[in-house]
Design a protein with these regions (language model features):
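Catalytic metal-binding/acid-base residues of hydrolase active sites
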Residues: 190
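Short conserved active-site loop signatures built around small residues
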Residues: 165
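Active-site histidine-anchored catalytic micro-motif
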Residues: 168
Length: 243
């Protein structure tokens, strides 16, 4: 049976990692073979030879109020940041009509953990009920990001551990290819939290030195960050002058 599948193109990207917080600097860091895996001051308090690719630079979102930022966990804040960067690159951030039709799919693994870390780490005085209310749910980042970015085309959460982000991209692709949406924002976001690091450490799967692609090392290096891409139906992108 003949099917009329739509063509799908990528029109915007955003990135946040231990190497950079924008696409151009990230690309240059990769070309220069920079290594973002370092000794972790955060986890060295708990574990020996603690190494990770951590996001250490400050996240700059001047368009958000301090009150809003305080209510978001890193999973939501990072997802918002890379999502907005992708919309800016796509030329859609100031297009209300386009945002009204755009859906959001977010891939996560341990979202909702941060608000309760003070309880895990015996820092009861740092526990915030407001943050727990806004960011304590597993899918809280979806509602936060869609609201802050003005996306009204529906939201979905993918929680399939290490495959969450590519699954989010695949689902967004399917929505467009099958004519269910003309544009989608796919986001992956994952901070490293103490329970996650402790779990991999207890399994003895982390290598004491930095891993690299095809290095053949008998272990892994854990990292954190976020990424986003805007996917559009080809004719939709051409009609609005996307490049």
């Amino acid at each position: 049976m003949k099917t009329n599948r739509k063509r799908v193109v990528i029109t915007g990207m955003g990135i946040l990692s231990s190497l950079a917080d924008n696409i151009e600097d990230f690309r240059l860091a990769l070309l220069q073979k920079e290594n973002g895996i370092t000794d972790s001051a955060r986890f060295s308090e708990w574990f020996e030879n603690a190494r990770a690719a951590e996001v250490l630079h400050e996240i700059d979102c001047p368009e958000l109020s301090e009150e809003i930022i305080a209510s978001l966990d890193n999973a939501a804040l990072w997802a918002y940041k890379v999502g907005r960067d992708a919309l800016i690159q796509a030329g859609l951030v100031n297009c209300p009509r386009c945002l009204d039709e755009m859906g959001l799919i977010v891939g996560v693994s341990s979202a909702g953990t941060e608000a309760f870390l003070p309880l895990f780490e015996q820092r009861i005085q740092d526990f915030s009920l407001r943050k727990a209310m806004y960011s304590g749910g597993f899918s809280s980042c979806c509602s936060s990001v869609s609201t802050l970015l003005g996306l009204k085309g529906g939201v979905e959460l993918v929680a399939t551990a290490c495959t969450a982000s590519p699954n989010a991209v695949g689902m967004a692709f399917d929505y467009i290819q099958n004519g269910k949406s003309s544009a989608m924002l796919a986001v992956g976001t994952e901070p490293i939290y103490l329970p996650t690091f402790a779990g991999f450490y207890a399994l003895n799967v982390m290598h004491p030195v930095s891993c690299s692609p095809f290095s053949g090392q008998s272990g892994m290096s854990i990292g954190e960050g976020a990424g986003a891409i805007v996917l559009e139906e080809y004719e939709h992108a051409i009609a609005r002058g996307a490049t």
